[in-house]
Amino acid sequence: MNTIPTRCLLGGLLALSLLAYAGEGDGTQHIVIDSGDTARSWEAARQSQEQWNATHGLRNKVNTRVEKDFDRYDQAVDLQEKCNSSQNVNAYWEPNTSRCLDRRTGRSLLAP
């Protein structure tokens, strides 16, 4: 006796639930395919390249300066050893100026 209204009620509920489910997803599902060639990505890549170039240039300057300082120090050590082992009795090493000087005249000795 109650089977027909129950079946109609269940069928109606099923139809309503399917309509409600189908209506929810209509406006929210979007598929965006981007090749990465947008203006924003080009600008970000350009800025990244500029920053890399700037840091690379600064690193090169720092490395060049360090090499020059090392070469100066290395040359000063060589001159000091040469001055201290010199046969000239009047030759002495001046550490403040990193030069080999003559005790009598105070002049720089080119070849100690």
Curated annotation (Swiss-Prot):
Protein name: UPF0482 protein SG1468
InterPro entries hit by this protein: DUF1283
Pfam families assigned to the protein according to its UniProt record, in alphabetical order: DUF1283
Residues that span the membrane, as ranges: none
Family membership: Belongs to the UPF0482 family.
The organism of origin for this protein: Sodalis glossinidius (strain morsitans)
HAMAP family: UPF0482
Keyword Manganese attached: no
Signal sequence annotation: 1-22
Keywords: Signal
